[in-house]
């Protein structure tokens, strides 16, 4: 049970981090 929650949390965290990085790079490209 805890392993499933841990893997799901890491997946969501990784997805948020990746989308945040792509959004940040896109914002920097448009600003410059």
Curated annotation (Swiss-Prot):
Membrane topology, from the record: Single-pass membrane protein
A GO term from the CC aspect: host cell membrane
Subcellular location, principal: virion
Subcellular location: Virion; Host membrane
UniProt keyword annotation of Cytoplasm present: no
Transmembrane segments: 2-24
Keyword Transmembrane helix: yes
Assigned keywords, A-Z: Host membrane, Membrane, Transmembrane, Transmembrane helix, Virion
Function according to Swiss-Prot or TrEMBL: May initiate with G7P the virion concomitant assembly-budding process, by interacting with the packaging signal of the viral genome. The assembly-budding takes place at the host inner membrane. In turn, G7P and G9P are present at the end of the filamentous virion that emerges first from the bacterial host.
Family the UniProt entry places it in: Belongs to the inovirus G9P protein family.
Name assigned to this protein: Tail virion protein G9P
Organism listed in the record: Enterobacteria phage M13 (Bacteriophage M13)
């Amino acid at each position: 049970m805890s392993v499933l929650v841990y893997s799901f949390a890491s997946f969501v965290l990784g997805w948020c981090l990746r989308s945040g990085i792509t959004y940040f790079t896109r914002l920097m490209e448009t600003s410059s």
